[in-house]
Amino acid sequence: MIIRPAQLLDIEKLSPLYAELGYPVKEAELVRRLKTVLSHPDYHLLVAVDDNEIIGMIGYAKMLFFENEGAYYRILILAVLQNYRRKGVATALLDAVKNCALSENIHALALNSGDTLERQIAHRFYENYGFKQASRGYSLYLK
């Protein structure tokens, strides 16, 4: 397995990962969306590839702190195909982001995760990785 930056040709292969997260999306819409997101220099997407198949992805953005100096990486999406879970793929993706952060002198990672029964396994994974529950998230959709 290798972890590498996503390429434009990869985008159309990511829809199964979105579907497994509960966000089914048409390939054309996903291509359009990710081209926009990834055109921003602070947004990044890494993919895990095994035997020429994309089996996982992690998307993150460099954010600036308001409350103190410096920056952090906010993980915006992390997904692994069902057949590859519990095989170290998500850990490898997080390790890659952590290494990128440390190379840029960034010393914090943050993420939000849905408060649903389906996400309980992910929450345990994050805690086992070293994340601490630090806040509560809220959403207000305006459309």
Locate each region found by the language model.
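Acetyl-CoA-dependent GNAT
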Residues: 8-70, 76
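Short coil/turn motifs at secondary-structure junctions
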Residues: 63-65, 80-83, 114-118, 143
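Conserved N-terminal entry element of GNAT/NAT acetyltransferase domains
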Residues: 1-9, 143
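Short hydrophobic/aromatic beta-strand or adjacent loop that forms the aromatic wall/cage
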Residues: 43, 133-138
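Conserved acetyl-CoA-binding loop-helix of GNAT-fold acetyltransferases
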Residues: 80, 86-99, 124, 128
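Short coil/turn segments at alpha/beta junctions that flank glycine-rich nucleotide-binding fingerprints
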Residues: 87, 104-107
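Conserved hydrophobic beta-strand within the GNAT/NAT acetyltransferase core sheet
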Residues: 75, 109-113
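Conserved active-site alpha-helix within GNAT-family acetyltransferase domains
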Residues: 91, 107, 115-135
